[in-house]
């Protein structure tokens, strides 16, 4: 199968997802260094989630019989002066990803590619939750008297965790991808809310 504009955009999005994963690791490490373990854990988990979004896309491209070249990524931001800065960056990143997923969905529809359209529809729904969760976290941080209030909020509300899987709301996906792609690729159990199998977790 020859690459189409949709497939070329999707291949580029693989790089964007890996870049988002790396940025979340950098944010998590910064919070870790500030002795804010729940914020750190939240973003380590977000990093894993973005990585596995990328792997889902890689698996999809390969399953469609298309060769893929994994793109490189730009350096990420590691230094922040306030705790609000990484949260603002994270929200902006999720909004940018949402815009790119919308572009992918539109490209699949333009090409009359129902498989691509269905695949991207899952990511669109995911991004609604991701943007909402990150917006909530940023708003809580801005209203909190101190960062330990944010830590307690994360412990109480499990923002971005959602019970550890997409079967309930939205959590992390793990590295394996089976189920929807026939026969399975990697290990794990199938979460009812995802088009893929979830392979490892934190």
Locate each region found by the language model.
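Iron-associated oxidoreductase/ferritin-like identity signal
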Residues: 1-202
């Amino acid at each position: 199968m020859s690459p189409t504009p949709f497939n070329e955009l999707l291949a580029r999005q693989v790089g964007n997802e890996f870049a988002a994963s790396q940025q979340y690791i950098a944010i998590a490490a910064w919070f870790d260094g500030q002795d804010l373990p729940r914020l750190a854990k939240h973003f380590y988990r977000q990093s894993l989630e973005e990585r596995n979004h990328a792997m889902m896309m890689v698996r999809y491209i390969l399953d469609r019989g298309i060769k893929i070249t994994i793109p490189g990524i730009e350096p990420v931001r590691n230094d922040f002066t306030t705790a609000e800065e990484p949260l603002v960056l994270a929200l902006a990143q999720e909004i940018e990803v949402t815009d790119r997923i919308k572009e992918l969905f539109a490209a699949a529809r333009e090409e009359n590619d129902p498989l691509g359209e269905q695949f991207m529809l899952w990511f669109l729904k995911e991004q609604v939750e991701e943007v909402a969760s990150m917006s909530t976290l940023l708003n809580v941080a801005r209203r909190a008297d101190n960062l330990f209030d944010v830590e307690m909020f994360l412990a109480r509300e499990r923002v971005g965790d959602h019970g550890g899987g997409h079967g309930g709301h939205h959590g992390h996906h793990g590295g394996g991808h089976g189920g929807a792609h026939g026969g399975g690729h990697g290990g794990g159990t199938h979460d009812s809310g995802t088009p893929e199998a979830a392979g490892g977790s934190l």
